[in-house]
Amino acid sequence: MGKIKRVHKKEINNSLDQARSIIRDLHEHFNAGKKYKFTERLVGSAKWNIVLKDKNGFFDLDYQLLLTKNFKKIKNYDKNVEKKTEATMIKEDFFNYLNEKYSDREKYDLQNSTTAITFINKKAKFSIDFVLIKSLPDNNQIIRRDNTKENPTINRYVWNELSMNNEAYKKFKRLSPKQKEDLIENYILPRKIIEKQKDPNDPNIISSSRIFKEEVNNYGA
């Protein structure tokens, strides 16, 4: 295993090209069926150009897929035989399409996690997390797994309130380019490197989003 390294811009651009291709596929598929419409938003480390490779050389990107008011709402979810929630049906639609589209398991893998659909490019060693958000009226609901005790192995998803802690992002936008560079290079990146060196299963790992918010809020305080 190697050291924790910052991802080169060319590698990030290649992974962003893959992400855009996947998103185009999703748009074309669901628009053709007049089922869902959504916009996409790059978030997290890639947005600020502070992506790190782990010890195995892997790195990840994060996208939010914002379902708009134009998506065709499927009614009577709870009246079908399997009594699936609206969130479950939507998550399954997106996951099943991608799982079939990128079915070559020598090249790709798809994982259905608590909140995200994770696309993994095994050869290029990167992953992309796609999180589904109900964008209207307030961009404040995210799909999250909520399996029941009676059927813990059956994936069930619900809409959960999304944290609206945007003050850190507003403050970051107000900073000058020089301040942003200082904050990223001297405060955020060193902490991300420390966390990246930990075991992935360590329950005490601090997320990149938390590091970002904490360091922005503390900057200049």
Show which residues each predicted segment covers.
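Extracellular secretory-pathway ectodomains and N-terminal mature segments of eukaryotic proteins
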Residues: R6, N49, R105-D109, K213, ...
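Active-site nucleotide-donor binding segment shared across nucleotidyl transfer reactions
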Residues: H29-L61, L65-N76
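Catalytic cores of NTP-dependent nucleotidyl/adenyl transfer enzymes across multiple folds
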Residues: Q111-A221
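Generic detector of well-ordered alpha-helical segments enriched in charged/polar residues
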Residues: N13, D17-R20, R24-H27, T88-F95, ...
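Short loop/turn segments at strand-loop or loop-helix junctions that form parts
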Residues: M1-G2, Q64-N70, L132-I133
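Helical scaffold of the NTase/Pol beta-like nucleotidyltransferase catalytic core
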Residues: M1-V43
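Conserved catalytic core of two-metal-ion nucleotidyltransferases
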Residues: F30-K34, N80-D138
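A short, highly charged nucleic-acid-interacting micro-segment common to nuclease
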Residues: I4-A19, F71-A87
